[in-house]
Amino acid sequence: MATPFFHVDFEQPNEMRFNRARVRRAFIHIGQRHMRDARRLVMRRGRSEPGENPGYQSGRLAKSIGFMVPRASKNRPGFMTRIAPNQRNGQGNRLITGDFYPAFLFYGVRGGAKRRRSHHRGASGGSGWRLAPRNNFMVETLKINSPWTRYYLARELRLSLKPEKRR
């Protein structure tokens, strides 16, 4: 007795059409969402404690956070998003002039924190920090948005691949 065998054959198009504009729009949307969430993390008013996200006083840090999707070139397809404070050529940001303030927040400042004449912060003369390091809010934003970013980018890549129309 012969084994049952069923075979369906169909022609598959050789070429797939890739919609670059759709993928670039997806990266722009990802940049906008990450920028929004990073700004929300630093918008809490009031004084911040060491290890917390930076507090909001003048709004310069929050307004400086921007994103950029680079243009495509012969060496680079342009499928990436840069999100950072003081992002050059960034969209939706105002640059911070002077010293790079986010670096002071991340690394902290010890200079000028020695015990001086006005050492009434405690018996030891303070903590040794003029500005203690704060939380890295950009890394926290990336962690929060990581599952959504993967899902959204995979969906847009899938939808941007279409088979070429036969004529």
Q: Each predicted region: which residue ranges?
A:
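Short, Lys/Arg-rich flexible segments
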Residues: M1-R94, F100-R167
